[in-house]
A protein has these predicted regions:
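Conserved "HGTGT" condensation-loop signature of ketosynthase/thiolase-family condensing enzymes
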Residues: 1-83, 103-108
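Conserved catalytic cysteine-centered active-site region
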Residues: 39-56, 88-131
Length: 131
């Protein structure tokens, strides 16, 4: 390999997430549903987050992508891979491309270039599909 091969930026270079602001406390949930709090606490934890009325899996993912681009000052035109991992997609074939479109519109609105046209946009689902 030549020297330039070793200088390429490969791998994960940043991480960002979006966590919805809405939370359900599981102790309260147990009171409402007549479930056993000690068991739920041990198995699930103390709370879980839920999306708001203006949120979807796509808006939450697009928000996380925009945070990643902004926090790490990433050139969107240089992004070659944008993977969406979810158990909650409403469209089993187009979720990641929907997120890419949302991100491209947000980038355009902020005066930045869109993600690369050659950016790969797969969607991954690995858990809870069987019910």
């Amino acid at each position: 390999m030549n020297q330039t091969s070793y200088n390429k930026k490969i791998g994960v270079s940043g991480l960002a997430a979006y966590v919805p602001p809405y939370r359900v406390w599981l102790e309260d949930w147990c009171d409402w549903t007549d479930n056993q709090w000690p068991k739920i606490r041990e198995v699930v934890g103390r709370s879980f987050r839920v999306r708001g009325p203006d949120h979807s899996v796509y808006t939450m993912a697009a928000t996380a992508v925009m945070r990643l681009i902004e926090q790490y000052d990433i050139d969107p035109a240089g992004v070659k891979f944008l993977g969406l991992g979810t158990e909650s997609s409403t469209d089993n074939s187009a979720g990641a491309i929907i997120v890419k479109g949302m991100v491209d519109r947000a980038l355009e609105a902020s005066g930045r270039p869109a993600l690369s046209r050659t950016c790969e946009v797969p969607e991954f689902k690995h858990a809870c599909l069987g019910g």
